[in-house]
């Protein structure tokens, strides 16, 4: 891993003392866990009376919530910072890059008036006040311990109908390739009651899809209760008036019989399993410090399909890990072809200083790793197309997220598609010309499919909120 290439040629300028609160904008980068932190900072600043703009051009100060998971993410964060600095913006750098490279950022970017660590975003109002007073602030805890809850102000940035709910922060596992525990600390779970209370708040705001996130969601509760309580959490969320509860980041060993039973029994918990398996070959999994015993992933998938035969399965994989041979890769390719996942994401290995994998020998040439990624995705595409094609001719529920009043076309998602990472459903008006508004869940008859997306037509019914098609 290389440190981000930062700029040091811009002269330092003093921070002027301001009588009025400055306008503030946010630039969000990285994962949805980072998004929740951004939303809390937005809520805190709004509550404190700051003018929060959605346009960086209108703001005097820009809070950049950064990502530092892999080299590409760091480079994107640095490009964003430099671009804003060149516009003359004062910067508050938050998130994983701030946690990772705090001194380098302050030394190299004069416009950086403050840095805020991953466990310190709750202090954003105090940090901004100190910046207004002319201070340059380093608010980064060496060992993050904070986790936000339902009492912390929050201003959502997602579509009205979709919300992310962080059930825990940090991670107790030490996968060889992952820097996250060093950036976000050990696992800190929220109490069940706290999570359910926030879910009720979100339901009152009209949320139709609640997405549970943490680093290892299925490990929820182990630190707090002495044993995982994810099954109990899912059961409790079954009492919340939100039609879809989706789970991201399900670590394989956490999918116990009790958890699978909750998926099966709780009506609003979607049978959508996001499984970061990373690889299939025991040698590679062992080097990754992942569950590696022979056929461990095969047995897990067999158990899932036995308990949840209609489950939608997504996985993420890493190719080019140090020591991965052609035989190892072929094992992975055969695994993908045999298991026939609905959705697959593939990443090439990114060496990170401070992780065990950074010092491993037998690095795979980046061009070979990239070619393996392309081969794996080419193998998966016809599988994904076949999995989608099964839905043609069926009527399914679709959550509408976009609507073009000129054409009548709508875009939404069904329960087999998670936001951002999976496909979409293109929805045409019903035979009577009816259209559905964003934020509504409506029946759609599926008429077509491709590798990633579905196409369908709104079903005429008196039970849904619709708007009449406007004549042109």
From Swiss-Prot:
GO terms for biological process: tRNA modification. Residues 157-386 form the Radical SAM core domain. SUPFAM superfamilies: Radical SAM enzymes. One of its GO terms (cellular component) is cytosol. Residues 22-133 form the MTTase N-terminal domain. Disulfide bonds: none annotated. PANTHER family: RIBOSOMAL PROTEIN S12 METHYLTHIOTRANSFERASE RIMO, RIBOSOMAL PROTEIN US12 METHYLTHIOTRANSFERASE RIMO. HAMAP family: MTTase_RimO. This is Ribosomal protein uS12 methylthiotransferase RimO. The lineage of its organism: Bacteria, Bacillati, Cyanobacteriota, Cyanophyceae, Synechococcales. The gene is rimO.
